[in-house]
């Protein structure tokens, strides 16, 4: 396989953590991982309020349990997805098959775009529910900073995941170009589908096998001097 296919060198090389952490997509994964922790951590720790007059806790976002559940679910799943693809980034240089690398990069594009969309939905949902929340439900303003942090980092996550999708698409384009020769090129002399054998440049000298040597004129074929006119006797 050609070196550099889909953004990584030839398979079998030694693992280089310094090169890994310098990759833009790896940096964005780590940032997205941190953002997801902030989102679900803020909601789990301070997203539910207690009212002395009520026995059960309620969600800080307009008392809508779906808002808190959505933020926690998306945050946890995005956290796990980041870990999965960070592990894939570590293993990716060891993948020797160009087709397998292509599948990994395509999955990166799809998953990253998927999470960018879900973070966009989550940001809109949480921001809307926060705007319509009633002050009387939280007179002491408990957990307001955490609620705003979850909204803000949901917004930031849109761009980190979209950036991962863009970088993965760039890797796909570069990888497709670099793998083109190794996948499609075939030596004509080894191609059995060709109707005729390839032309072989004749070499100087004798050809004992009689296969493609230089043409040899028969000895004395054209060496005889032309004879003069011979009169016929009558």
Curated annotation (Swiss-Prot):
InterPro entries: Marvel (IPR008253), Synaptogyrin (IPR016579). The chain crosses the membrane at residues 24-44, 72-92, 104-124, 149-169. It is found in: Cytoplasmic vesicle, Secretory vesicle, Synaptic vesicle membrane; Melanosome. The keyword Acetylation applies. The modification N-acetylmethionine is found at residue 1. Residues 1-23, 93-103, 170-234 are cytoplasmic. GO terms for cellular component: melanosome; Schaffer collateral - CA1 synapse; synaptic vesicle; synaptic vesicle membrane. It comes from the Eukaryota. This is Synaptogyrin-1. It comes from Mus musculus.
């Amino acid at each position: 396989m050609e070196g550099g296919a889909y953004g990584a060198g030839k398979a079998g090389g030694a693992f280089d953590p310094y090169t890994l952490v310098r990759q833009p997509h790896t940096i964005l994964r780590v940032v997205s991982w941190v953002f997801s922790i902030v989102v679900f951590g803020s909601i789990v720790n301070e997203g539910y309020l207690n009212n002395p007059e009520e026995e059960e806790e309620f969600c800080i976002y307009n008392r809508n349990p779906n808002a808190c559940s959505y933020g926690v679910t998306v945050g946890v799943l995005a956290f796990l997805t980041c870990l999965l693809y960070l592990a894939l980034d570590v293993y990716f240089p060891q993948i020797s098959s160009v087709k397998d690398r292509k599948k990994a990069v395509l999955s990166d594009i799809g998953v990253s775009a998927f999470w960018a969309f879900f973070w966009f939905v989550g940001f809109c949902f949480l921001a809307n529910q926060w705007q319509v929340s009633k002050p009387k439900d939280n007179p002491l303003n408990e957990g307001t900073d955490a609620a705003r942090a979850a909204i803000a980092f949901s917004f930031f996550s849109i761009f980190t995941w979209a950036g991962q999708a863009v970088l993965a698409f760039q890797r796909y384009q570069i990888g497709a170009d670099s793998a083109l020769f190794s996948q499609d090129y075939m030596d004509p002399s080894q191609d059995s589908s060709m109707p005729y054998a390839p032309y072989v440049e004749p070499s100087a000298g004798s050809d004992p096998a009689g296969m493609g040597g230089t043409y040899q004129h028969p000895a004395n074929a054209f060496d005889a001097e032309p004879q003069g006119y011979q009169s016929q006797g009558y």
